[in-house]
Amino acid sequence: RDDVESRGLGDVYKRQVPYDLFVSGYNSEAVSKLRLWKAEMADFDMSMFNQGDYQKALSKNIISQAITKVLYPNDNHAEGKSLRLRQQYFLCAASIGDIVNQHMSVYGTLDNLHEKVAIHINDTHPTLAIPELMRVLLDDCGYSWDKAWHIVTNTFAYTNHTVMPEALEKWDCNLLKSVCPRIFSIIIEINERYCKDLWERYKDQAKVSHMSIVEDNKVKMATLCVHACHSVNGVAKIHSEIIKKETFKDEYLDTPTKFKNVTNGIAYRRWLYQSNEGLTDLLCEKIGDGFLKNAAELSKLAVFKDDKDVLDRLAKIKLDNKKSFAKYVKNQYGVVLNTDSIFDVQVKRLHEYKRQQLNALNIIAQYNYCLLYTSPSPRDSTSSRM
């Protein structure tokens, strides 16, 4: 294992320990590396422990372990927000430091970092990687602001996943300043230069205020991403249009070439080939196995849309999978599920903006619809929804 020195979170979080998982490619000799991080206390205070102050000696270790114990816990209170921010910065700092170290070992310079490395900001959680790379270039490597900013803005790309205002991540300036003061000062400098440039070009204070990265004593992480990244995309055509016409309208009008659409999908060899053996067998039988390397091959299924035999087999596969899941739930939790019901599943944290309550109301509405239109009498209905 390698140890990487962290900065910005104090002595408690001195050590960042990487743990690597190797992921093999499909029908190839390629192996990718997935690097995870664990926080550890740099040094155990044996002197304090020997003096009998066990609680204080161990408290630093407990706090350190909390950073990577549970990712993104509930943040509807001050402690949760602070821990979440510390987690974000810890992971960003560890990853940026690792990227820089590996690049330096090969090229001996960061002048060409943006030509050899692409860093993807997938939603706003890793946004602190932007000012962290600036910090490394400015403080550790002695780059000028303009040169460092050129490297940063040509290295990062941003994918936006939501346009709901309440889901666009914002951090309180006081909290950000207390957790990682140097990073906060870099963000403020980025914003001041950005707003100055906007004012010189538009002479419109309302526009400048709206496009500012800092507003109402909060740092708008999505706005920072849009400003600092050379590419900004939504995950569906309609989503990308909303980004351009509503959410980031002024930013789009200012830098239209960086906005694009990249339609989301699934890793189908993972979530189809590996996870759904029955469906994979049916697909291979009907259209061959070409879809395992080319997803466009799945369009060949269209000819079977009215094929009763195929539809019946598909229904059986779905039922078999539900039975398999119900068996797992019973064995693990002792809960019996009705496999004739519709399974409505959300792998999401419970939060207002996730709309779980709205989804629950929809389930009730569909249930009432089934009672009303699919049964001679509501008492005879066997339709339900999990």
Language model feature labels by segment:
Residues 2-13, 373-386:
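Single conserved hydrophobic/aromatic residue that forms the stacking wall/gate
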Residues 6-7, 11-124, 171-235, 247-349, ...:
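Active-site cores of enzymes that catalyze phosphoryl transfer or operate on phosphate-rich substrates
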Residues 48, 130-133, 160-168, 244, ...:
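Short acidic, glycine/serine/threonine-rich loops at helix termini
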Residues 93-97, 132-141:
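Alpha-helical support elements that line or immediately flank enzyme active sites
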Residues 127-129, 143-173, 195:
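Active-site-proximal binding-pocket segments
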Residues 129-130, 343:
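N-terminal alpha-helical segment
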Residues 236, 241:
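Substrate/cofactor-recognition hotspot
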Residues 354, 362, 368-375, 379:
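A conserved nucleotide-sugar
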